[in-house]
Structures are given as structure tokens and as C-alpha cells.
Amino acid sequence: MKIVGRGFKNSWLIVGLPDAGLVGAISAAHIVKALGLETIAHVESELLPPVIVVHQSRVYDPVRFFGREGLMVLGSEVPVHPSLVYPLGRSVVEWAAKEGVKGIITITGIAIPNRLDIEVPEVYGIAGGAAELSDMLAKANVKNFEEGFVVGPAAIMMREGIRRGIPSIMLLAQCFLEYPDPGAAAQALLALNRILGLEIDVKPLLDEAEVIRVRTRELMRRTAEALKQMRKAHEYEVPLMYT
């Protein structure tokens, strides 16, 4: 696996990959569209499905980086198969370290059984690495994720980031497990706005929620299959060592 392309030094890298409720994927796509970010790099691997993305008659790779000075985004048009989780996580963090990022913020979903009863999903944060990251979350009014498991690419990137000394934050929005959740993505982006001082408008996510659900349902279906193999439902459990 290799990443082809260069990033912007001293920039935040936002990672949003297909996961529970497609929270990360929807968030990443919305950031790119809202800020008009251009493709700067892509992932090449034989572990990826044999897919290309065609947009306005131009060909793109399915897993790619977008960016500008100060901010980069990693998004994917395809599910992250379990066999891809470790090599992708390590490669992304290694590339981020080489490019001299300021830090990595991963956006993901934390599935809850009663999501249907919650009008405004909560967003929790995990801070790893530099001590001031916890202060950043507190100042942004993001609650700490106190106990539990996190499964998937976000978990690997957080762990690898900490090992390499890269400031790492994970934002987890309450969401549906196997149903696209633009509402959860909107809340995650509002938290991101507060953390980084951005002004990403989330109103389109809420206004076009049903359109987004229809447009992403096939990606959600294929992602759900991958999540089952990764035991994503394991996140409902409490760690035995800390009970």
C-alpha cells in the first residue's frame, strides 16, 4: 500500500471513512464540498476493490486526500474491508507524520440502540497525545468518551497516531448502526467547527438528509457487511478490565 501525493505541512488532517451510520464519510464529503477542497493525494493498494470514480468525465481513485493550507481531509467512496484496516491506518498515519501534520482528527459514529428517540445526537471526544488536546475538547464543549470500545479504522489511526507522537482526536457521534445518519454527521461537524474555529455550514446536511440517505444507501449496505466482520457491535459492551 502506498499514498501518492503531497500534503500541506502544519495542517490538521480530518479523517472520515465509511463506518457506523456513515458519519465519517458523510462528514468528509460535506467538508470537501463546503470548502471547495481539491484532490491532493490518493491511496493505492491491491487490497482496494477494482473501482474508479468518474466525476465530470474525470477519473479519480476511490480513497483520496483533499486539502488546502491548514486543512486536509481523507475520504473514501468504498467501504473499508477488514483486511484493509491495519495497512490503511498505518499508511495514513505514516504519511501524516512525513507531511508534518499539526494533528489528526478522526470523525466516526458510535451506534446506539435508541437513536430513533434522540433528536440531537451527542458527540463525544477522545484525546490522545498532547495534553492540550483535552483542553481543546473541553473548550469546545465536547464531552469525554469515558468507557467502552471503539472498533474500526478510527481506532487504528488513533492508536498509531499516539504511538508516533502525533496529536490525535477522535470525535464519536451517536448514530444508527446500519442507516445513513446525516444528522449525526452535522453534530460532529459542529463540534469540529468549535475545536478548529471553522465555519462549515451544516444546514445542507439537515435540509437534504433524505436525499443523502437515498444516495448513500448502497455504500451503507456494503459498509454494514464490513462492520459485522469487524464486530462493530462490540462497542455496545463495557471493557471487562474496568468494571
What do the predicted segments below correspond to?
Residues A41, M72-L74, G103-I105, P167-L172:
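Hydrophobic/aromatic beta-strand patches that form the interior of the parallel beta-sheet core
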Residues A29-K33, G89-V92, A186-L189:
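Short, solvent-exposed amphipathic alpha-helical segments in soluble enzyme
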Residues M1-V78:
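N-terminal short beta-loop-beta anion/metal-coordinating cradle
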Residues Y179-T243:
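A conserved C-terminal secondary-structure "cap"
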Residues N114-A191, I195, M241:
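Catalytic cores of processing enzymes, dominated by hydrolases/peptidases
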Residues P18-L22, V80-S83, T108-P113, V151, ...:
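Gly/Ser/Thr-rich loops at beta-strand to alpha-helix junctions
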Residues Y86-L133:
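Internal, conserved structured core segments that host functional sites
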Residues E38, V93-I104, I162-P167, I195-E199:
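Secondary-structure boundary elements
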